[in-house]
Amino acid sequence: MSPGIGMPELLVVLVLALVVVGPQQLPVMMRKVGQMMAQARAMAKDFQNSFEEIGRETELSELRREIDALKQANPINQIHGELDKAARGTQDDDIRALKLKHVEQNQAETDADKAAKAAKLAALDSEGPQSTTPEADARADAAASADETERAAPVETTPAKPVDEIKGR
């Protein structure tokens, strides 16, 4: 048997209410009982909805965690990260190679300058003892600075263009 209220039980309750309350107060009392039952159902429904909402939020948070985990485990992102690292490494290697080449060029130029000065000193020593007058020292310094200037800034000469070519005629 089901524990619900059937038709015979409902008739017994109505007859008792009629006897206890009376025929005049019965409609008012039934209205109040109906309102109380509606409030009880509304409260039960709100309670049930709040539990369902908590369940949905929990499911959504779990789904979000799974999506984030999948995004992090995405092989495309891993490959992209590895390619970025490789590109940075290649750029660093290129920069190091250029710096090393520049240092070697500077070292070669410095060695060439030292060799040229040593050759000049050897040539001066082979000419014999010279007087160390200020005029002789000034001439030697001027010759050395002229050689350095020629090596430091090679001058390229280009023929002048006629005015007609410049204006586009």
Curated annotation (Swiss-Prot):
Example of a GO cellular component annotation carried by this entry: TAT protein transport complex
Span list, region Disordered: 106-169
A GO term for molecular function: protein transmembrane transporter activity
Keyword hit for Protein transport: yes
One of the Pfam families matching this protein, by short name: TatA_B_E
InterPro entries: TatA/B/E (IPR003369), TatB (IPR018448)
KW Membrane (keyword) present: yes
One GO BP: protein transport by the Tat complex
Keywords carried by this UniProt record: Cell inner membrane, Cell membrane, Membrane, Protein transport, Translocation, Transmembrane, Transmembrane helix, Transport
Cell location: Cell inner membrane
Broad class of where this protein is predominantly found: membrane
Transmembrane regions listed in the UniProt entry: 2-22
Membrane topology recorded in Swiss-Prot or TrEMBL: Single-pass membrane protein
Summary of subunit composition and partner proteins: The Tat system comprises two distinct complexes: a TatABC complex, containing multiple copies of TatA, TatB and TatC subunits, and a separate TatA complex, containing only TatA subunits. Substrates initially bind to the TatABC complex, which probably triggers association of the separate TatA complex to form the active translocon.
Family: Belongs to the TatB family.
HAMAP family, per database record: TatB
Described purpose of this protein according to its UniProt entry: Part of the twin-arginine translocation (Tat) system that transports large folded proteins containing a characteristic twin-arginine motif in their signal peptide across membranes. Together with TatC, TatB is part of a receptor directly interacting with Tat signal peptides. TatB may form an oligomeric binding site that transiently accommodates folded Tat precursor proteins before their translocation.
Database matches in NCBIfam families: tatB (TIGR01410)
Full protein name: Sec-independent protein translocase protein TatB
Gene from which the chain derives: tatB
